[in-house]
Regions:
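Structural beta-strand/beta-sheet cores of well-ordered domains, especially the beta-sheet scaffolds
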Residues: 59-65, 78, 234, 255-258, ...
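Short glycine/threonine-rich loop-to-helix capping motif typified by GTGT followed
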Residues: 136, 174-176, 243-252, 332-333
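Glycine-rich phosphate/diphosphate-binding loop of Rossmann-like nucleotide-binding domains
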Residues: 199, 204-312
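ADP-ribose/adenylate-binding Rossmann-like module
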Residues: 316-345
Length: 345
């Protein structure tokens, strides 16, 4: 509960000015609860309207994205870029391509990105973007045409010293490559810092693909060691099977854990012998298939419909790596009931 009068007043204004945006309002309330410990020590913040500026994006860009599918029919999606805060550096945050993407979710993610980036101690601001385009089931040519159309509008708002988007759900090296190629053609120069997550052969960074998944495991390993534990011999459940989840599973396995379950939006797989990462990577990276294929190809593995049911699998450590807000109260209760002693997100 927020009891600070200044924060209460700002929150009321945010709720009035941003109706119908539950994800964004949730993020603001959560951050304000933490800020209650700090705000009373800095009365100058209220005089300067600092929190009011903190919760209002500097710029919101919304645009249509027309593209042609393989049947020659024009499709239209909506694109977003929320440039939230550039106080300490260029806007930085990923692009998400998923049917659930809307303005509230993009603002929610962009708002949290300000704080995430500031914690790195690097001079990066916060932003987020994306589209309600669904790359699943689309051909490479369709994804390419969409990405080219998307960046043809967004290019005028980004740059290596202005805004440097990256990947997120639905946006990997393939999509970043399509967008960067179109960006380079439009601006007629090689601008290596404008889109991060590129392939190594055209300006990408070593281990960028693995960074987020590895990062959660390195962080978790430090926490475990602080409590006299480690990944060694622990049974782990990881939700998701995208970029973050895949490399979290890889690093977790290297650190001695046994990943027994992973999921996608339709259901989850359970392999009591531990997920075979070679098979998983082949299915998800090369074939871009559903995770259910794993159960068809690996003896002893099972596929269960319903991705939320993954938290019913017995484990020592649970790692939500699919999307935001994915572990609700029921999921948390299930994780505890099934023996987990740690949750890392």
């Amino acid at each position: 509960m927020i009891t600070n009068e200044y924060l209460q007043r700002v929150l009321a204004d945010v709720q009035k000015n941003h109706p119908g945006e539950p994800e964004f309002l949730q993020a603001v309330e959560e951050i304000f609860e933490s800020l209650q410990l700090v705000v009373p020590k800095h009365p100058e913040w209220e005089a300067a309207g600092l929190i009011e500026r903190f919760v209002e994006p500097e710029r919101i860009i919304m645009f249509r994205v027309p593209w042609v599918d393989d049947n020659g029919k024009v499709q239209v999606n909506r694109g977003y870029r929320v440039q939230f805060n550039s106080a300490i550096g260029p806007y930085k945050g990923g692009l998400r391509f998923h049917p659930s993407v809307n303005l509230s979710i993009v603002k929610f993610l962009g708002f949290e990105q300000i704080l995430k980036n500031s914690l790195t101690t690097l001079p990066m601001g916060g932003g987020k973007g994306g589209s309600d385009f669904d790359p699943k089931g689309k051909s490479d040519a369709e994804v390419m045409r969409f990405c080219q159309s998307f960046i043809t509008e967004l290019y005028r708002h980004i740059g290596q010293f202005t805004d440097t988007p990256a990947g997120d759900i639905g946006v990997g090296a393939r999509e970043i490559g399509f967008m960067y190629g179109q960006y380079k053609k439009i601006v007629d120069r090689f601008e290596g810092g404008v889109l991060t997550g590129k392939g190594l052969t055209y300006g990408g960074s070593l281990a960028r693909t693995q960074a987020t998944g590895y990062g959660i495991c390195y962080f978790s390993d430090e926490v475990l060691h602080y409590h006299g534990k480690s990944f060694e011999g622990q049974t782990v459940v990881i939700s998701g099977s995208g970029n973050v989840a895949q490399y979290a599973a890889e690093k977790c396995t290297e650190l001695g854990g046994k990943v027994v379950a992973m999921s996608d939006s339709k259901g989850y797989i359970y392999d009591p012998n531990g997920i075979n990462l070679d098979v998983l990577f082949d299915i998800k990276q090369k074939r871009r298939a559903r995770i259910s294929v794993y159960a068809d190809e690996v003896a002893g593995a099972q596929y269960v419909e319903g991705c939320k049911n993954i938290w019913n699998v017995k484990c020592d450590i649970a790692m939500p790596c699919a999307s935001q807000n994915e572990m609700d109260a029921e999921g948390a209760k299930a994780v505890i009931a099934n023996g987990a002693f740690a949750v890392f997100e």
